[in-house]
Each structure stands twice: as structure tokens, then as C-alpha cells.
Regions:
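Structured mid-domain segments that build the active-site/substrate or prosthetic-cofactor binding neighborhood
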Residues: 1, 5, 9-133
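Gly/Pro-rich turn-and-neighbor structural signature
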Residues: 49, 59, 63-70, 74, ...
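Single conserved hydrophobic/aromatic residue that forms the stacking wall/gate
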Residues: 2-8, 158, 162-169
Length: 169
């Protein structure tokens, strides 16, 4: 599974940084959510903290990738042909964005019950009721999407970029 996938992060947030499938600690360890039904504010607090950690890991990983591109000459020949000041950009992205918006929307506007394994690890969810979904022109879901994007970008911008690149998404 993709460590940088937002839905994967959401799952490990609920389990105190542990991956539900592998039972391996994949993020910072902290107290898992133990309630039967998910509370929006509690989930958002843990998700925000996990996103902050994830943004740092993500940028460090991309810095290594960009450094290796520079080191092994992938773009050096092309860059030599540019006769002006180069404005470097550093693009990041959010895998699973709509899934997380929908998940947070379900927690906020419906009732989401956790399904746990024999060890108490959240492995699934049961949603009772309806909730606004991303991409359906509903301001309630859009507000969650805007919060998610702004929050992640603010956390993302805290990290130093290779070659003083400009932030992008």
C-alpha cells in the first residue's frame, strides 16, 4: 500500500499510527481512537497531526528523488540549454483526495461505526445515514475539501525544498 496515500493515512490515524492490514507501525505512535462511533473533531485532530508528519516525510522523499535526478544527469543537458534564470518548481500531490473528503464527510454528517478485529484494530467501517460527497456541488463536502487542501499545503510548505524550489501542487 502507498504510504503517501491519504486514505491509508486516515486508517493508520485511527489505529495510533499502525497499518490495519500489516499491523506494522507506519507513522508516529500515539493513542488510537477507541470509541465505537467516530467523533469528527477527534478524527480531525489526529488526522491533522498525521498529515503534518506525512508532509515532512513526503517532501524529504521527493528531495531525494530530485537530488538523484540532478546527480545522475537526467535533466542537466536540458537545463544547459536554458539561457535565463531558472524558476524551479516542486510539485506535490494528494493521492486519494476525494476518498478522504468523503470519509470525513461521512464522519461529520452521518454515523460511522468502527469494525475492529480481535486485537481492537479498526479494519472496516459501517456508515449509517447519508452524507454529502465530493464532486457533487455540495458546499458541505467542498468545505472539507478546501480545509484538507489548505491544511496539507500549509504543512507541506514548512519543509525545505531542494534548490530553493517553489511550492506547487
Amino acid at each position: 500500500r502507498d504510504l503517501h496515500s491519504f486514505p491509508t493515512r486516515r486508517s493508520s490515524d485511527l489505529n495510533g499510527g499502525m497499518d490495519a492490514r500489516t499491523k506494522v507501525q507506519v507513522g508516529p505512535e500515539y493513542r488510537p481512537i477507541t470509541s465505537e462511533y467516530l467523533d469528527y473533531d477527534e478524527v480531525l485532530d489526529k488526522y491533522d497531526k498525521m498529515m503534518d508528519w506525512l508532509a515532512r516525510v513526503y517532501v524529504r522523499t521527493l528531495n531525494v528523488i530530485h537530488y538523484m535526478h540532478d546527480k545522475y544527469y537526467y535533466e542537466a543537458a536540458e537545463m544547459a540549454l536554458i539561457d535565463t534564470d531558472v524558476r524551479r518548481t516542486f510539485a506535490t500531490g494528494i493521492a486519494g483526495f476525494s476518498h478522504v473528503v468523503d470519509s470525513l464527510s461521512a464522519i461529520k454528517y452521518a454515523k460511522v461505526k468502527t469494525v475492529r478485529d480481535e486485537n481492537g484494530v479498526v479494519v472496516d467501517f459501517e456508515t449509517e445515514g447519508d452524507f454529502p460527497r465530493y464532486g457533487n456541488d455540495d458546499d458541505r463536502a467542498d468545505e472539507i475539501a478546501v480545509w484538507l487542501l489548505k491544511t496539507f499545503m500549509a504543512q507541506d510548505r514548512k519543509s525545505t525544498r531542494l534548490n530553493s524550489s517553489h511550492h506547487g501542487m
